[in-house]
């Protein structure tokens, strides 16, 4: 499948990794023109669905998770967004991240953990199962304004979320409330 040349910021090119789930290969293409997420049939290479995204260049890998019996996708960006894995239907978004997001979100404890640390530090813990625009809502369980990684992914291990900020600041917070 040829997606043609895309207008990436600083000519860095794609940095997202495709994710395979069942027969679907999920690919995120966030760039300076029309960004999108697409599901490709792994057997035929045919497009199953394609959903446009209101994003500029990001280099994040999508995270697939299951909630309430449904497979879903959460993708980091200037807004963290979730989509239905089977249809590509937009479910929710939460703004407030920095531009040029790279870390893949972590999911667990009924939360999506998204981090972005370029030009401003932000870590959000977003309650799953919501719909629509969650920015500045009670759907944000907690957030941090320091120690967010620019490149490394947050890692959820048991009840703890580990964050490695790019200048070697390592932190561990409780997943349920963000306290250190």
Show the residue positions of the predicted features.
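Active-site neighborhood of glycoside hydrolase catalytic domains
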Residues: 36, 42-44, 52-58, 69, ...
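Conserved loop/turn at the beginning of each blade in beta-propeller domains
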Residues: 10-11, 33, 55, 98, ...
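Short loop/turn segments that connect beta-strands within beta-propeller blades
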Residues: 41-44, 84-88, 127-132, 174-177
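Asp-box/WD-like beta-propeller blade repeats and closely related beta-sheet repeat scaffolds
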Residues: 1-30, 40, 48-51
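Repeat-blade elements of multi-bladed beta-propeller folds
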Residues: 13-29, 58-80, 101-123, 148-169
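Aromatic (tryptophan-biased) beta-strands that constitute blades/sheets of beta-rich domains
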Residues: 1-7, 46-52, 89-94, 130-145, ...
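Glycine- and Gly-Pro-enriched alpha-helical subdomains that act as flexible
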Residues: 164, 171, 178-180
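Structural motif
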Residues: 34-38, 82-84, 120-127, 168-174
């Amino acid at each position: 499948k040829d997606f043609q040349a895309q207008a990436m910021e600083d000519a860095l090119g794609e940095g997202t990794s495709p994710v395979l789930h069942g027969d679907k290969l999920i690919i995120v293409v966030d760039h300076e023109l029309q960004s999108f997420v697409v599901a490709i049939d792994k057997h035929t290479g045919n497009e199953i669905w394609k959903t446009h995204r209101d994003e500029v260049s990001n280099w994040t890998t999508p995270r697939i998770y299951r909630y309430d019996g449904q497979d879903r996708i959460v993708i980091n960006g200037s807004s963290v967004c979730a989509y239905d894995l089977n249809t590509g239907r937009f479910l929710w978004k939460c703004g407030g991240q920095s531009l040029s997001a790279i870390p893949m979100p972590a999911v667990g404890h009924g939360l999506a953990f998204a981090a972005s640390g370029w030009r401003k530090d932000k870590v959000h813990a977003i309650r799953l199962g919501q719909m629509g625009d969650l920015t500045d809502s009670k759907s944000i369980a907690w957030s941090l304004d320091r120690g967010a990684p620019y490149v490394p992914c947050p890692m959820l291990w048991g009840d703890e979320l580990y964050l490695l900020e790019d200048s070697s600041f390592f932190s561990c917070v409780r997943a349920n409330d963000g306290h250190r």
